[in-house]
Amino acid sequence: MVVMNSLRVILQASPGKLLWRKFQIPRFMPARPCSLYTCTYKTRNRALHPLWESVDLVPGGDRQSPINIRWRDSVYDPGLKPLTISYDPATCLHVWNNGYSFLVEFEDSTDKSVIKGGPLEHNYRLKQFHFHWGAIDAWGSEHTVDSKCFPAELHLVHWNAVRFENFEDAALEENGLAVIGVFLKLGKHHKELQKLVDTLPSIKHKDALVEFGSFDPSCLMPTCPDYWTYSGSLTTPPLSESVTWIIKKQPVEVDHDQLEQFRTLLFTSEGEKEKRMVDNFRPLQPLMNRTVRSSFRHDYVLNVQAKPKPATSQATP
């Protein structure tokens, strides 16, 4: 999940250093080839993405994200309510390249675009949505299901406006954020997504921004109401454990050409050496002692087309 620029000032001013807990990938889950411009640590003499350079040490909390969701280990919770989504297309403001993903931001001073229900006690206002994707269609999602990953993952980021005065405060506190995760899989052309894809040539470079009004992101949601939920963190600095994750079970279909347009974006500003914006996902984190709850019974069959994680790493352009 991408953190807003306004959090960078908070992060840089944060006192003290937090402990690092080394992430270890289980042997049965070989590592995906994550771009070292986006990962949390340095290897093979590759530089970190600038987003991570202001972090002295990565916090070693026990509620970090993303995770691998084990279908049969998730616990059905009959008390989970249906998730209610109400977005006002008029609150959509613009789309911009922040050097890590592209974000579509929304006006959030009122409750015009909110979610409620599900595992949430309060209304949460929509702040922005963005995507994570891979260099090829075999991987790209941050979360995985039974060790399978998807070509891309959509994150719709909301904040608790009942308990907090602004997004920046909510992003640093427990139960401050609610993020809906939606997997993207290869399939038919997505007509509504294409409206967004058509803007991408205008924001190829970092910091480019264009107006993008009257868009309802619920058109990017699957029709199936089923979801998993767990307590986790931001997947970019400051990695605060402030997120209630709501991961939709059913993916949405997009075609290969639409994903290829994502890959035309750049991490870099105009005039700098070009670095393709691909593999902008964080490595999987340990589940630790957390429980992943589901809103559906386990007699469902996983009706998704996903790629198994590759057994060997490949270099990213």
Curated annotation (Swiss-Prot):
Localization of this protein: Mitochondrion
Regulation: Inhibited by coumarins, sulfonamide derivatives such as acetazolamide (AZA), saccharin and Foscarnet (phosphonoformate trisodium salt).
Keywords: Lyase, Metal-binding, Mitochondrion, Transit peptide, Zinc
Tissues in which the protein is found: Strongest expression in heart, pancreas, kidney, placenta, lung, and skeletal muscle. Not expressed in liver.
Recorded catalytic activity of this chain's protein: hydrogencarbonate + H(+) = CO2 + H2O
Sequence similarity: Belongs to the alpha-carbonic anhydrase family.
Stated name of the protein: Carbonic anhydrase 5B, mitochondrial
Annotated source species: Homo sapiens
Lineage, highest ranks first: Eukaryota, Metazoa, Chordata, Craniata, Vertebrata
Gene encoding the protein: CA5B
